[in-house]
Amino acid sequence: MACEPQVDPGATGPLPPSSPGWSALPGGSPPGWGQELHNGQVLTVLRIDNTCAPISFDLGAAEEQLQTWGIQVPADQYRSLAESALLEPQVRRYIIYNSRPMRLAFAVVFYVVVWANIYSTSQMFALGNHWAGMLLVTLAAVSLTLTLVLVFERHQKKANTNTDLRLAAANGALLRHRVLLGVTDTVEGCQSVIQLWFVYFDLENCVQFLSDHVQEMKTSQESLLRSRLSQLCVVMETGVSPATAEGPENLEDAPLLPGNSCPNERPLMQTELHQLVPEAEPEEMARQLLAVFGGYYIRLLVTSQLPQAMGTRHTNSPRIPCPCQLIEAYILGTGCCPFLAR
């Protein structure tokens, strides 16, 4: 059976299961005369079955949907960037294994294993009342399992280098169109579903604020800025051409084909530390910060996991922070907790 990508037109389609905070986002039907878009407004959602192979996003349908909002974004500008970021086999497997049902299943297995180990260990000691001992074992297993679940939930609130940050190139191409991409996943029946969100955001004010903030940090907090930027890096594998052996001095005497060719030999790979936000002019660094963490912001926005703010700069909701507030407080701030989930 063929797998067809689905398009959710934002406010007019059914509520995606992974967006409990949809009501907190500006919504509405496709715009009429005089209707304006607001920062944080969901434009459309592409949904595809992650259990099918091969798959691809129906970006043509998304392009048509964006045109109904008056946004002209040719899909060719970001098609390869989005699909190469999210649809590689290893990324799709990661999304499945990192889904909420898989985490729940792991927690159940963890509880059973911990309970059995604690119970078997307790049999070596005399605990008096058998039922009291069983209760203590159960409470200990439940406590450890709840701790594991809390660790999982805290991990989900960090920027995910395997999903969120892979959209940096696509978001960099879409910044000038006032659109940001974000990715979430859900499970429908036995199917893993990837959801690609298109959200409207005019980031010029955020760019200006972050430019000024980066310039100020370069002047008065340069060591802190360098420390925070040094954490914004990922490890990448790149292919390396094997060094050719030294041949005869006269190139005319060299054989046309190498003598010790091994067609089944695996290519050489090397790991490189790639800086996500390299040192540059403040405005360029501000745009790069927004591109890198735009996918992270959108995921937190559509799943209602953004930290509550007492005021906002560039969104209509007084309790929803804008991207520059999130980056200022949690990426460039003085907090000691790591913000990348690797």
Swiss-Prot record:
It is a multi-pass membrane protein. The lineage of its organism: Eukaryota, Metazoa, Chordata, Craniata, Vertebrata. GO terms for cellular component: plasma membrane. It is found in: Cell membrane. The gene is TMEM268. Interacts with ITGAM; this interaction inhibits ITGAM degradation via the endosome-lysosome pathway. Interacts with ITGB4; this interaction prevents ITGB4 degradation. It holds the Pfam family DUF4481. The chain crosses the membrane at residues 105-125, 132-152. Its main location: membrane. This is Transmembrane protein 268. Stabilizes cell surface expression of ITGAM and participates in the adhesion and migration of phagocytes during bacterial clearance. Residues 1-30 are annotated as: Disordered. It comes from the Eukaryota. Keywords: Cell membrane, Membrane, Transmembrane, Transmembrane helix.
